[in-house]
Amino acid sequence: MDPTKFLDQFLGGDSKAKLQQAGGAAKQQFDRMGGMGGFAGGAAAGGLAGLLLGNKKVRKMAGGVVGYGGAAALGALAFKAYQNWQEGKQAASAPAATEADMPRTEARFLPDAAPAATGEPFQLSLIRAMIGAAKADGHVDAAEQKLLFEQVERMGLDAEAKGFVFDTLAKPTDLSEIAGAARTQEQAAELYLVSRLAIDPDHPAEKAYLEALAHRLSLPAELVAHLDRQAETGLSA
């Protein structure tokens, strides 16, 4: 299993670029599907994340992390948040990451920079974190899990990758396991960020989940605010 390829497949890869290359008809179809709720809207953006998160969250990701290359985009957002925080900028007015920032991302912020504290590829830790966050509101019911399993079968993943997704979906979310994957503050920031991308902060259960995760990751409140800012505004062009 190639962990970076798996993470990109999970996020939907460069679906935005593919839609632009396909022309107006494909984009119109995407827009129509995006107007539908739940899994239908999520499927329009491609990737398991699209199905898992549903329409309310995936539309943002389709223009950002999904649209600009998945794993590399996560690193760019985390690095921009970290950079703004270190420079003492106010989170509310801090500049958002753009496509031009991606080549300037420091290597330590890329998901493949180092293994997780547990020894597993850190890309798998990020996928586990996103699945856990998406389940925080309890919306992944048995019928939706069945659709996810069917989508996994269609994606051409190898047996190891399939098993990872199936096991993570089936078992209860363990915040200690998710937070325990962080070897460095950079990894902690990425685990929080990928979870924040899957969270609706207006939903009480999801907000509580995110606050608990930030606490477990020992992230400074100011850095958390910058990560929230990038999750909302980064790579949104």
Identify the residue ranges that each predicted region occupies.
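Small-residue-enriched hydrophobic alpha-helices in membranes
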Residues: D2-R128, E144-A237
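Primarily EF-hand calcium-binding motifs
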Residues: I131-A133
